[in-house]
A protein has these predicted regions:
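Glycine/proline-enriched, intrinsically flexible loops and inter-domain linkers
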Residues: 2-86, 91-92, 96-121, 126-555
């Protein structure tokens, strides 16, 4: 098929070419992420893997499902497609102008248009987009790391940048880069990581252009349509058909916002399934609590909830007939036509009013995954995993032996919920598929020792299938420093399903057994830790599934 073009071919895509295109898209997305991971500088991106790439077509539809990504909508809103040129790179991180795709300011997003020859005029035109965003070390704001737990406005969280053209026809905008690096406590890492993102996306754009040049614009775009249509049909037939028609309600809570005294911040989903409707699944967030004074808000009510639909849709895969089939299902734009989202009025956790702070918005969007799982478990008689809370940021900052400032942050996972067919997974990083930092690396770069990194014994909730275990990590500081934490589930545990018990909550203890022993809350900015003191972190265990008395005796 090499060199064969189908510019005026049939409207139905060649099924063989569809497989070629789908495989190429997945390979390009993986190449972009691999390039970013190998060429970036900061531990948060290079080692913890807190970044993502995505491929979108000219209609702004997400084509790939291996990874979640942001949206192209805000870029095209401010820079019409017709004004774009080969070599352009667009940049933004403004939470309130990102259409819901960017949740907090340290997530810096770059977008590169892909060009190919128009089949009629022969002129180069935009046919797709390569996009990547990563969690950068520091973008300014009140505290190192740009995630102040006591922020009461987004202005305290760092530099906000609306969509701008960062590269123009292959030439970087040095003035914009100077402004961003000047506002960062880690300017060298910021510059290097941004360059890694831009270079990787430009390389991905060249690879995708080659695909269009080889098979023709019309043929490849027909394959895009076929890929998304297949996803829509598979989710309608194999997944949504397992949800009985009816209306179901579930709610859960974030525990605190970092500013007010700990209290419950409600998140509610009313799910309605109507198998006869063109849009069969309705997710209504009415009843979600008012926006918080602290930074746990998430801007979800943009682009008709486009980002949230793709964010929540992976939970639906648990309804697949077998675990093997679940692993085969991707989440791309094909799920969007099947879901309607209804948002409450402005001024809630999901519809905050500018300039409400958002840096700890994981408390809300991660909890929504659990709320959707809970309401689906209710609807399907327990065909859902128990609850899990598998992301939290912890870290230390101070000065090293040379007097230079340092910042170490880590995304620590936890145990996933027990499932109807197996125990939960131990110490996983479901979102955003991140990793813990290697001990050898952190000890060689930062002034502390890792004295323990293992499983938190018995942290998973009991059940016929127990919840996964969390981390038990202990570090001993070699110099005075400050500890930071952005974590929830330190009071309320991950709940079980069908009689399964709750897992153990998150906890941080400084100087355990020592004269200054103290247990910290989940949201902490600058807890002083003296040289020689130990910080003990135990992350959440997942909830159990099923009655513990039904557990196999040899399990």
């Amino acid at each position: 098929m090499k060199g064969q073009k189908h510019e005026n071919g049939p409207s139905e895509a060649d099924p063989v070419l569809v497989e070629i295109v789908a495989g190429t898209l997945a390979a390009i997305e993986k190449e972009v992420e691999t390039s970013i991971g190998r060429t970036s500088r900061s531990p948060m991106i290079r080692d913890a893997h807190d970044f993502r790439a995505g491929i979108h077509d000219r209609k702004l539809r997400k084509l790939t499902g291996r990874s979640y990504s942001a949206l192209v909508h805000p870029v095209v809103r401010d820079y019409p497609i017709e004004t774009m040129n080969v070599g352009d790179v667009y940049f933004h991180n403004d939470v309130y102008l990102s259409e819901g795709g960017i949740g907090h300011l340290p997530d810096l997003c770059v977008t590169v248009p892909v060009f190919a020859a128009d089949p009629d005029s022969g002129e180069q035109r935009v046919v797709a987009f390569i996009q990547a965003f990563g969690h950068h070390d520091d973008i300014g704001g009140a505290v190192p790391g740009s995630m102040p737990s006591a922020a009461t406005s987004v202005y305290e969280e760092g530099l906000m940048v609306p969509p701008i053209k960062l590269w123009d026809r292959g030439v970087p905008n040095e003035s914009a880069l100077k402004i961003m690096t000047r506002n960062s406590r880690m300017p060298d890492s910021l510059a290097a990581d941004l360059d890694a993102e831009c270079s990787a996306c430009l390389a991905g754009a060249r690879r995708l252009s080659e695909l269009f040049d080889r098979y023709g614009v019309a043929a490849v775009e027909a394959c895009f349509d076929a890929i998304l249509a297949s996803s829509t049909e598979v989710y309608r037939r194999e997944i949504l058909s397992r949800i009985p028609d009816g209306t179901y309600v579930w709610e859960d809570y974030a525990e605190h916002d970092g500013v007010d005294e700990p209290k419950l911040h409600r998140q509610r989903i009313t799910l309605t399934m109507d198998s006869t409707a063109e849009v069969p699944l309705t997710i209504d967030f009415t009843g979600t609590g008012p926006q918080a004074r602290g930074p746990i808000n998430h801007c979800g009510d943009y682009a008709d909830g486009n980002f949230l639909k793709k964010w929540l849709a992976p939970i639906l895969r648990n309804l697949a007939e077998t675990p093997e089939r679940m692993a085969q299902l991707d989440v791309n734009e094909g799920v969007v036509p099947l879901i309607e989202m209804r948002f409450p009025q402005k001024g809630t956790l999901l519809t905050p009013i500018f300039p409400a702070p958002t840096n700890a918005r994981t408390f809300v969007i991660l909890r929504l995954l659990g709320v959707l799982a809970g309401v689906l478990a209710k609807a399907t008689g327990g065909r859902m995993p128990a609850d899990q809370e598998t992301i939290r940021y912890t870290g230390v900052h101070g000065t090293d032996d040379a007097g230079e400032p340092y910042l170490m942050r880590e995304v620590l996972g936890g145990g996933s919920g027990g499932r109807w067919y197996a125990d939960g997974e131990d110490t996983i990083h479901v979102v955003p598929d991140s990793r813990n930092l290697p001990t050898e690396f952190t000890e060689s770069r930062f002034p502390f020792l890792v004295e323990r990194l293992g499983l938190a014994q018995d942290s998973g909730g009991p059940g016929e299938f127990r919840g996964g275990l969390g981390y038990d990590k202990q570090i001993r500081m070699l110099r005075d420093a400050s500890f930071m934490s952005i974590a929830d589930r330190s009071i309320l545990s991950c709940w079980g399903v069908k009689g399964g018990r709750a897992g153990r909550p998150f906890s941080v203890v400084v100087d355990p057994g020592g004269p200054r022993e103290r247990e910290l809350e989940g949201l902490v900015d600058d807890e002083p830790v003296l040289a020689g003191e130990v910080i003990r972190i135990r992350t959440t265990g997942g909830g159990g599934w099923g009655d513990p008395l039904d557990r196999a005796t040899d399990a």
